[in-house]
Amino acid sequence: MDRRNFIIAGAAAIACGYGVGIALPKTRADELYLRPPGAVKNFESLCIKCGQCVQVCPYHSIDLLDIAQGYSNGTSYIDANKRGCYLCDLFPCVLACPSGALSHDTKVIGDVKMGVAILVDANACLAFKGESVSESGVKNLLDRKIYNDREQAVKDSIKVKIGSICDLCASLCPVGESAIIIQGNLPLIKQGCVGCGVCAEVCPPQVIKIVPNKTYDEIY
């Protein structure tokens, strides 16, 4: 059984658990989890836990929450520190969603409002310290299994930065300079940030985090 089928089968098994008296904690999932692009405000109630968005994501960015996440289990989310959202053309995850949990009005990057990035430890930032990207620092990214040309392109973009002063967060951002730039040897998050999480994924010291369901104005 491959990874995606395992996830979906697990979600089905979890759903069955409701019928046998499993007590699940309530959570504020809308505040805790980074959802795929196009997620509506009442995402948790509309998501039918079908896993279609997981199956079609070419970057393998989307997973399903497990039973430890309470009533949110089986719903789709993105762990940006493992794999951000690369904001694909046509948003296949949105097109695959049958329930309206991901709004089909999401057609261009400007429609996406997943959250906003924050720098949590400037002193550990490689750019701030004037340090180069090392092969060991991005080993986890380069060792990741590749399934398609898009993922290979990401790996190649990371590999060419080895030996250069780190600007991975800015150079790999799918939004571009309207979202993040390096200014004064530090990442500067700008109003164009949509919270895709790519900067968090590729940051070697993991000092960028995503605040889900918040806007730039709410954070900055």
Regions found by a protein language model. Name each.
Residues 1-220:
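Non-ligating segments of multi-cofactor redox enzymes
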